[in-house]
A protein has these predicted regions:
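Short catalytic micro-motifs in class I SAM-dependent methyltransferases
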Residues: 112-113
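C-terminal alpha-helical "lid/dimerization" subdomain adjacent to the S-adenosyl-L-methionine
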Residues: 142-191
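Short glycine-centered segments of the SAM/dcSAM-binding site in methyltransferase folds
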Residues: 43, 136-138
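A conserved beta-strand element that flanks and buttresses the S-adenosyl-L-methionine
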Residues: 109
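A short glycine-rich, Lys/Arg-flanked "PGG" loop and its adjoining helix->strand segment in the class I
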Residues: 123-135
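Conserved Class I S-adenosyl-L-methionine
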Residues: 51, 173-215
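Class I SAM-dependent methyltransferase SAM/SAH-binding core
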Residues: 45, 51-97
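Conserved class I S-adenosyl-L-methionine
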Residues: 1-39
């Protein structure tokens, strides 16, 4: 099991504590409302759904959601939430190999996963992500900005330009976690061959990028 997967399996009981930071509540409410609006009437693929924090809100508006994660422990928590099971299916799947998923989707949400992708693996992830999507599908990327005093400090850089944080869980265990904070131009360049109508917005603590899948 890789470090990131181990970390999230161990963090499962405190997974959503990050959403309790007082200074981020306004931004989080904005994101919830935005995702409910964007997912209305959509067939959604949610990548790296974690404990279903974002799934729960979208389920009120979406036609259907396939929510995938590669960590069994967080999926167990997600399945315990009050979510319409006729709309939402949680699936254990690898974000880098979404080919086994059955069906096509009119929207994909990648929330707080892009920052964990090593820069050298972004092309592989994008090939995987776009496999189940169709022309004009909406792709929504949401992730953290680096905000001094609120974000966990960066403690390491590697030769590929990836940045790392040292994260400590409530049991005192420490993990070296890859966490990148891309700029708009880097995101735009990464998805350029797949995207049309690219749009990028920044909130105080988060960024949001959307685009339509090009022909």
């Amino acid at each position: 099991m890789d470090t990131l997967k181990t970390y999230y399996s161990k963090r499962v009981q405190e997974y959503e504590s990050i959403y309790h930071k007082p200074e981020r509540q306004h931004d989080l409410e904005h994101l919830k409302q935005m995702l409910r609006s964007l997912s209305s009437g959509q067939s959604v693929l949610e990548v790296a759904c974690g404990t279903g924090y974002w799934t729960q809100g979208m389920a009120e508006a979406a036609t259907s959601i396939i929510a995938v994660d590669n960590v069994a422990e967080v999926l167990e928590v997600a399945r315990q939430k009050r979510i319409d099971e006729s709309k939402v299916t949680f699936v254990k799947a690898d974000a880098y190999d979404l080919a086994p998923l059955v069906g096509s989707f009119s929207m994909a949400l990648v929330a707080f996963w892009w920052s964990h992708i090593p820069k050298e693996k972004i092309p592989q992830f994008l090939r995987s992500l776009h496999g189940p999507l169709t022309h004009n599908s909406l792709v929504v990327l949401v992730d953290n900005k680096y905000v001094p005093g609120s974000s966990t400090p960066i403690t390491e850089w590697d030769s590929s330009g990836n940045t790392y944080q040292t994260r400590t869980l409530s049991d005192g265990s420490e993990y070296r976690i890859l966490k990148n904070f891309p700029k708009e131009t880097e995101l735009r360049d990464s998805v350029e061959s797949y995207a049309e109508d690219f749009d990028y917005k920044e909130l105080d603590y988060f960024w949001i990028a959307t685009y339509r899948v090009a022909k």
